Amino acid sequence: MAIEILRLGHRGERDKRISTHVALTSRALGAEKIIFTEDDKHVKESVERIVESWGGEFKFEVVKSWRTYTRRFKDNGIVVHLTMYGENINKIMTEIREDISKTNKNLLLIIGAEKVPREAYDLADYNLSVGNQPHSEVAALAIFLDRLTEGKTLYSEYDDAKIKVTPSKSEKCVFVEKD
């Protein structure tokens, strides 16, 4: 199963920091690609620097129409929309994992930066809430991906990484490859 993240409504200068965090969280917790509906050189360069240093295969893509992309994806994939108005994650997560496992389909996860168009709710196979109180989309994304992978991606490492961290009780243990 490949996981892709579709970021709706990125607002340039206003959202560059949070959108960068969305991308980094996506990568760190197992996604293979993040898709934006507007190009942002700052976010793209930040993602590319992280991939260069920390390794792995994570792609940044821009699409003209999120609707077209989602419809095409849905033909052979499962679409989950994270929204505080959706079904309770505690009640629906097992069903989502089973659906993915049974069908062997890829996953497109939709998260919004601003008000999400009604059509996103209609296109989604699942509208899922991670709590029903206001919070960051980064928090919702992290919780969802961790639950989806059952914690298996928390300590991912990549063979091509130039920087690696070893968990330690009392000190920083960082390996940095010299050029």
UniProtKB/Swiss-Prot annotation:
Signal sequence range: none
UniProt keyword list: Cytoplasm, Methyltransferase, S-adenosyl-L-methionine, Transferase, tRNA processing
GO process annotations (BP): tRNA nucleoside ribose methylation
Pfam families named in the record: Trm56
Keyword set includes Isomerase: no
Entry EC no(s): 2.1.1.206
GO cellular component labels: cytoplasm
Subcellular localization: Cytoplasm
Binding site for S-adenosyl-L-methionine: L82, G112, A113, E114, K115, V116, V130, G131, N132, Q133, P134, H135, S136, E137
Catalysed reaction, written as an equation: cytidine(56) in tRNA + S-adenosyl-L-methionine = 2'-O-methylcytidine(56) in tRNA + S-adenosyl-L-homocysteine + H(+)
Complex and partners: Homodimer.
Task of the protein: Specifically catalyzes the AdoMet-dependent 2'-O-ribose methylation of cytidine at position 56 in tRNAs.
Entry similarity comment: Belongs to the aTrm56 family.
Name this protein carries in UniProt: tRNA (cytidine(56)-2'-O)-methyltransferase
Organism field: Methanococcus maripaludis (strain C7 / ATCC BAA-1331)
